[in-house]
Amino acid sequence: MSREGALSDPNAQGGDALDRALRPQTFEDYVGQRKAKANLKVYVEAARGRKEALDHVLLFGPPGLGKTTLAQILAREMGVGFRATSGPVIAKAGDLAAILTNLEPNDVLFIDEIHRLPAIVEEILYPAMEDYALDLVIGEGPAARSVRLDLAPFTLVGATTRAGLLATPLRDRFGIPVRLEFYEPEELGRIVMAAARKLGVPITEDGAVEISARARGTPRIALRLLRRVRDFAEAEGADINRASAARALKRLEIDEDGLDALDRRYLHALVKTYAGGPVGADTLAAALSEARDAVEDVIEPYLMQKGYVARTPRGRVAAPLAYERLGLKAPNGQQSALFGEDED
């Protein structure tokens, strides 16, 4: 999965380590997601008061909204240990069993991309989540027998951008489902200002506003843009203000609405190549030379949230705003094509 320019892979140029250093440590430091944060604080306080493990938590929403950060804060606020892994890494049931048996009482186990767990591993999780127990099969053939191994109470925090891909039995075992939403520009501005202070970067409030307005409602992108704008500002020998930020973002091909070159290629393909749709995700992914997951998880959520694209039972359809963005007039029948249930 790739994005062009400043929205490229988060591991690039050491950004991942820097993002970790800038992460908030407590609920008080965590900006945004007010409803989710308020509810989680109540659940944490109640669990601490009962001296119990927090109920299992499912964090879902578009990438870059702070799911890993929230999981770490939950462990810190509970005063317990934190173990992290990801769905693709746990290939066998034995891998998960080894992790679970090494947890201390009430620890938090964070599984990123939990929708990518193999089915055999999911089945191990069911008794672990419900009964804090592992059902293991020892031996083979007629001599095989089942053994139940007790586990210490723990909290599973699962994170996913594709909650709909979770098996229903697994999804139903999460007592606390939390949907994370895109951030408001004002919230991103506060995040950018706080990060700039930690980095020792001179920045004006209007400079932070310029960056946050183009960050697609996503803190991870806002922090990445801050680093790139800082590079351009330092090369110019200037502080970050509205003018210097706008110049840098223009060079990065990120427009006033936060759309980058890949977004514009998507809209161009949908509107001009496929006449506004409807067109399937696989077809669009092939036209962009991107994986379908990248189209569905990275490109489309923001475009749909901004009103450029709609999903219909027949495929993706360009909204009138997409035509306007490309300087075209929407066909008369295009508006009616937008109505109907979302595509699965």
UniProtKB/Swiss-Prot annotation:
| Record-level Gene Ontology MF annotations | ATP binding; ATP hydrolysis activity; four-way junction DNA binding; four-way junction helicase activity
Region of interest (Large ATPase domain (RuvB-L)), ranges: 1-183
Q: Cite a GO CC annotation.
A: Holliday junction resolvase complex
How does the record comment on the protein's domains? Has 3 domains, the large (RuvB-L) and small ATPase (RuvB-S) domains and the C-terminal head (RuvB-H) domain. The head domain binds DNA, while the ATPase domains jointly bind ATP, ADP or are empty depending on the state of the subunit in the translocation cycle. During a single DNA translocation step the structure of each domain remains the same, but their relative positions change.
Binding of Mg(2+): at which residues? T68
In short, the EC number is: 3.6.4.-
> Protein name, please?
Holliday junction branch migration complex subunit RuvB
Region spans: Small ATPAse domain (RuvB-S): 184-253
Residues annotated as binding DNA are R292, R311, R316
SMART domains for this protein: AAA
The record lists the catalysed reaction(s) as: ATP + H2O = ADP + phosphate + H(+)
Q: Which organism is it from?
A: Hyphomonas neptunium (strain ATCC 15444)
Q: How does it assemble?
A: Homohexamer. Forms an RuvA(8)-RuvB(12)-Holliday junction (HJ) complex. HJ DNA is sandwiched between 2 RuvA tetramers; dsDNA enters through RuvA and exits via RuvB. An RuvB hexamer assembles on each DNA strand where it exits the tetramer. Each RuvB hexamer is contacted by two RuvA subunits (via domain III) on 2 adjacent RuvB subunits; this complex drives branch migration. In the full resolvosome a probable DNA-RuvA(4)-RuvB(12)-RuvC(2) complex forms which resolves the HJ.
PANTHER family, A to Z? HOLLIDAY JUNCTION BRANCH MIGRATION COMPLEX SUBUNIT RUVB, PTHR42848
Its family remark reads: Belongs to the RuvB family.
Entries under HAMAP family matching the protein: DNA_HJ_migration_RuvB (MF_00016)
Q: NCBIfam families annotated for this entry? A: PRK00080.1 (NF000868), ruvB (TIGR00635)
Stretch list, region Head domain (RuvB-H):
256-344
**Does DNA damage appear among the keywords?**
yes
User: Which InterPro entries does this UniProt record tie to the protein?
Assistant: AAA+_ATPase (IPR003593), AAA_lid_4 (IPR041445), DNA_helicase_Holl-junc_RuvB (IPR004605), P-loop_NTPase (IPR027417), RuvB-like_N (IPR008824), RuvB_C (IPR008823), WH-like_DNA-bd_sf (IPR036388), WH_DNA-bd_sf (IPR036390)
